[in-house]
Amino acid sequence: MFGGGEDDAPPDAELQTALALETAKPSGDGTGNVTAKLIEMLPKLFFETRKDAAAVFNAIVRHPIGSHEDLPHVQYLNENPQLLRTIVEASELGEEMRHGNNAASLTYGTMLREVARYEALCRHILFSDAFLKMFDYMQLTTFELASDAAASFRELLTRHKSLAAEALETRFDEFFNRFNAMLENGNYVTRRQSLKLLSELLLDRSNAGVMMRYIASVENMCLMMNLLRDEARSIQFEAFHVFKVFVANPNKSAQILSILQKNREKLVAYLAAFQNDREDEQFAEEKAMLTRLLERMAEPGEEAEGGEKSAGTS
């Protein structure tokens, strides 16, 4: 599949195609094709053999067949989503949850990021119960397992943007309830990576509907205001990039506007001293913009700059 040999020859395209076709055929005993058996038997292989098997899996999954460039292994996985579930739930093989097989979990992680490249397979995963288990996997205390799960989580939510937006809108409450809980209670690395991903998702135009629902929530804004006061500077910094979306929203609810108005002076003072040692021109400009927006938010009964009464007052 990869060429090599004594002469370090390049891969033979015909042999690659033949291997992809042969491994896509169902077995005679009705137990599935080579793809299925490889997924199911992976934890039982020796370490180096397991790595080779995963490399072969990734290669045959992406190898096109014929003039129409069909992907038989993608089609097979699409028709057998239980195999995708096995791959997603592989973090449970790790030492904290079941069998103490961290290496197998990490190998499955490379396979998960490979299948995420294909929209049909990614759809199965994003709408599955197994996907929500990834919040638990990202909070494992074993750093390698948690980081690998976070890398796969990010790939699933950013590879196919329209699909991800559909999944987030459909599963909004169950997704963000878990996401916010992770931001409050997760470990430092998970919280920092998750905040960074959240700001990226909210600012992506594909997720405009998701963004408007998220920033309409008082609870979400209060969470970001609390994270702005976190002990870790990097958490504060990432929270800032989410909080700015609430402040910049021209269609704030009366409740959100009221909270910002009541905390206006404290927020302006906080921003004035917020990480001024950062040599980041864009960050400085965004801080200045937020400060101007907050200063223009007159409290109820006061007049905003320009002589107009603040929103929500009569």
Label each residue range with its predicted role:
Residues 1-107, 114-131, 138, 146-147, ...:
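Elongated alpha-helical scaffolds that mediate protein-protein interactions in large eukaryotic proteins
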Residues 2, 46-47, 57, 127, ...:
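Phenylalanine-focused residue identity feature
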Residues 37-48, 83-103, 133-144, 177-189, ...:
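Helix-loop junctions that connect tandem helical modules in alpha-solenoid scaffolds
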Residues 57-59, 109, 113-114, 153-155, ...:
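Structural signature of alpha-helical solenoid repeat scaffolds
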Residues 141-142, 147-188, 192:
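Active-site cradle of extracellular carbohydrate-active enzymes
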Residues 176-290, 294-314:
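Structured C-terminal portions of repeat-based eukaryotic scaffold domains
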